[in-house]
Design a protein with these regions (language model features):
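Structured surface interface patches that mediate subunit assembly and partner/cofactor docking
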Residues: 33-36, 120-121, 135-147
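Short beta->alpha connector loops
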Residues: 32-33, 55-58, 122
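Hydrophobic ligand-binding cavity/cleft-lining segments
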Residues: 1-38
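Glycine-rich portal/gate segments that line the openings of hydrophobic small-molecule binding cavities
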Residues: 38-88
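Short, surface-exposed coil-to-beta transition loops
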Residues: 3-5, 58-62, 98-102
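A short, structured loop/turn motif at beta-sheet edges
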Residues: 10-15, 65-73, 105-114, 142-146
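Beta-strand/loop substructures that line and gate deep hydrophobic ligand-binding cavities in soluble
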Residues: 77, 82-134, 147
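Hydrophobic pocket/interface hotspot
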Residues: 17-21, 27, 50, 64, ...
Length: 147
């Protein structure tokens, strides 16, 4: 498991960047580089359920480990969800990475926002994450600065 970090400075206040990150419409825009048609469904509760899903309804089962809007959110990934809605949090494949974190930290940077993202991941996904976050953060910047 490795930790990858990404950062961008956005000429917008933290709340605006937060809203672009997690608004249903804009979330799909910046996450399209991971998988077109991505959605996030969450009860927004620490210890509750959050799902990161592709256009077919399959994806990751996660929970919110820490939530301090608009400063930070930390997701802990627990398992997989297939397109039929079956959760897998127990298989050997899932247990190899279950418990890894994905962190979004928004720092006030003189009226701008420094968005810092950290994601724990298997080495085999590094190129996919680098491509997705590099392009995705640019979309977040564009949306937050122009909405």
């Amino acid at each position: 498991m490795e930790t990858l970090s990404y950062e961008i400075v956005i000429n917008a206040p933290r709340q605006k960047v937060w809203d672009v990150l997690w608004n249903e419409r804009t979330y799909s825009e910046w996450t399209q580089f991971f998988s077109p048609g991505c959605v996030m469904k969450s009860d927004w509760k620490i210890g509750g359920k959050t799902y990161f899903l592709n256009s077919e309804g399959a994806g990751m089962v996660s929970t919110i480990d820490s939530l301090k809007e608009p400063d930070q959110i930390i997701f802990k990934h627990l398992g997989m969800l297939d397109k039929d809605g079956n959760e897998d949090t127990e298989s050997m494949e899932v247990k190899q990475w279950s418990g890894c974190f994905e962190k979004y930290i928004l720092i006030d940077f003189g009226g701008k926002t420094k968005l810092h993202v950290e994601v724990q991941n298997e080495k085999e996904w590094e190129d996919h994450m680098n491509s997705g976050f590099t392009q995705g953060l640019e979309v977040i910047k564009k949306l937050a600065e122009n909405i």
